Amino acid sequence: MQALLFLLALLWPPEAGAEEIIGGVESKPHSRPYMAHLTITTKQGFTASCGGFLINPQFVMTAAHCKGREITVTLGAHDVSKKESTQQKIKVAKQIAHPSYSFYSNLHDIMLLKLQKKAKVTASVDVISLPSPSDFINPGKVCRAAGWGRTGVTEPTSDKLREVKLRIMTKAACKNYEHYDYNFQVCVGSPSKIRSAYKGDSGGPLVCAGVAHGIVSYGRIDAKPPAVFTRISPYVPWINLVIRGK
């Protein structure tokens, strides 16, 4: 995860996003059982991919810019190029993007995917905890992001899950992003490090002490940190309403 997240809209069809892991390492197989790989068919008929994470046996969280005509979720995967016995492939029944999501500003870049059936919880497939609405991660904290995205600006996407350590930055570090909003977004990745999420990682989680605090959203086209992640805590009340079917 070295590269910065870039607005997928600029590189992929607008229905799908993709950021990658640059400067990271291969994850221990199945050590992140909440990770989801999304195969997306766009409205134009192209195929794209995003990351996501299981927050409930029937709901996966991802970025709103990963929306497509159809999405299939693969859970329990390490190497997405192989048919692993741990994998569960489930089609998405409903894509629920946040009602205030803006394609132009990329604010409220969060979406819930309701699966056609509940995932079977196993050693390789499990949910991850979310923060409380008042839980704000502070600058200086080191968290991790994971995904199957590119391992470099000119490199292909990775078949195997990779992860990277990223530092939470102050809002001043993201001042050059015109629409950055500290209340709803997290500034992630030290400019002094060649580490980030990049194309293919969009929608994946930012995990701090075992809790999903952010969602890979966007960054610079040259993958230079910091990048912008959606902050999850302000959306917890909305998330709970969606899961309850309200």
From Swiss-Prot:
Residue limits of the Peptidase S1 domain?
21-244
Q: Name one GO molecular function term.
A: serine-type endopeptidase activity
| Alphabetized InterPro entries for the sequence | Peptidase_S1_PA, Peptidase_S1_PA_chymotrypsin, Peptidase_S1A, Trypsin_dom, TRYPSIN_HIS, TRYPSIN_SER
Q: Which residues form the active site?
A: 65, 109, 202
Provide the top EC class: hydrolase
**Single GO cellular component term:** extracellular space
PROSITE patterns annotated for this entry? TRYPSIN_DOM, TRYPSIN_HIS, TRYPSIN_SER
Q: Write down the EC number.
A: 3.4.21.-
- Name the Gene Ontology biological process terms: proteolysis
| Disulfide bond keyword on record | yes
Q: Which UniProt keywords apply?
A: Disulfide bond, Hydrolase, Protease, Serine protease, Signal, Zymogen
Signal peptide per UniProt: 1-18
Which residue pairs form cystines in this protein? 50-66, 143-208, 174-187
Q: Which residues form the propeptide?
A: 19-20
Q: What is this protein called?
A: Mast cell protease 1
